[in-house]
């Protein structure tokens, strides 16, 4: 059973349990279909294994940001918002402007957020604040990037391996949870509705040492 199917089945089981309590049904039809405890553990271990491959290493993040800084500086703001802010790369990060970003917090406007609700990302890590200050000293600063898709295709090659699906969001989630050990905070910043699921998915995805190295990446390291 795929993990996504299991999670859907878990939601259905909760719904039918409520129906049982209210007398809307006699039995919960999902109970018999639920995987065993051993099978659930196997599913989660496999998923965490995939998360480790989907997260970029600190070295790969440095390679990416070094490419942006030296070859295409207009990409640096976009890359930092995805890497250190956890913004969605297709809709959120490309549309951020200076007014949305301060050294205290990032505001994702409702028209760009996936759930159509304004999201505040805070607190920001010390290294991210240094990146923000570094970027805002430049002309143009945070704004939409012309030819973003074409430029980003080239930038992704800098890590030296195939680009994992949605790896920047997975990287942020993995390193943020490892650093702060607060699934609720990580889920809130990502715009995820379920902190319990996030905790299961990202617990042990990266080590504390890796998280420390990730959150220590500074602009001076990528020139």
Describe each region flagged by the PLM.
Residues 99-105, 162, 181-201:
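Short, polar N-cap/turn motifs at the start of nucleic acid-interacting alpha helices
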Residues 3, 80, 84, 91, ...:
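C-terminal catalytic core of tyrosine-transesterase DNA break-rejoin enzymes
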Residues 13-16, 20, 206:
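C-terminal flanking helix
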Residues 138, 212-223:
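C-terminal secondary-structure termini that scaffold catalytic or DNA-interacting sites
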Residues 2-10, 21-90, 169:
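Basic, Lys/Arg- and aromatic-enriched nucleic-acid-binding interface segment
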Residues 61, 123-161, 172:
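Active-site/catalytic core of tyrosine-dependent DNA strand-transfer enzymes
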Residues 32-41, 60, 94-130:
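Conserved tyrosine-mediated DNA breakage-rejoining catalytic core shared by Y-recombinases
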């Amino acid at each position: 059973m795929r993990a996504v199917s299991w999670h859907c089945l878990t939601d259905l089981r909760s719904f039918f349990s409520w129906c049982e309590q209210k007398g809307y049904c006699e039995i919960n039809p999902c109970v018999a279909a639920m995987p065993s405890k051993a099978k659930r553990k196997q599913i989660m271990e496999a998923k965490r294994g995939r998360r480790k491959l989907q997260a970029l290493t600190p070295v790969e993040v440095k390679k990416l940001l070094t490419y942006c800084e030296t070859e295409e500086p207009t990409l640096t703001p976009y890359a930092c918002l995805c890497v250190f802010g956890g913004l969605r790369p297709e809709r959120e990060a490309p549309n951020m402007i200076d007014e949305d970003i301060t050294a205290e917090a990032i505001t994702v406007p409702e028209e760009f957020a996936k759930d159509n609700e304004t999201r505040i990302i805070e607190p920001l890590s010390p290294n991210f604040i240094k990146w923000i200050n570094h970027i805002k000293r430049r002309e143009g600063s945070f704004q939409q990037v012309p030819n973003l898709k074409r430029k980003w295709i080239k930038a992704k090659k800098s890590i030296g391996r195939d680009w994992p699906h949605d790896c920047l969001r997975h990287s942020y989630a993995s390193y943020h949870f490892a650093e702060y050990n607060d699934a609720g905070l990580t889920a809130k910043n990502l715009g995820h509705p379920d902190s319990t699921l996030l905790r299961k998915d990202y617990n042990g995805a990266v080590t504390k040492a890796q998280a420390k190295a990730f959150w220590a990446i500074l602009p001076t390291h990528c020139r």
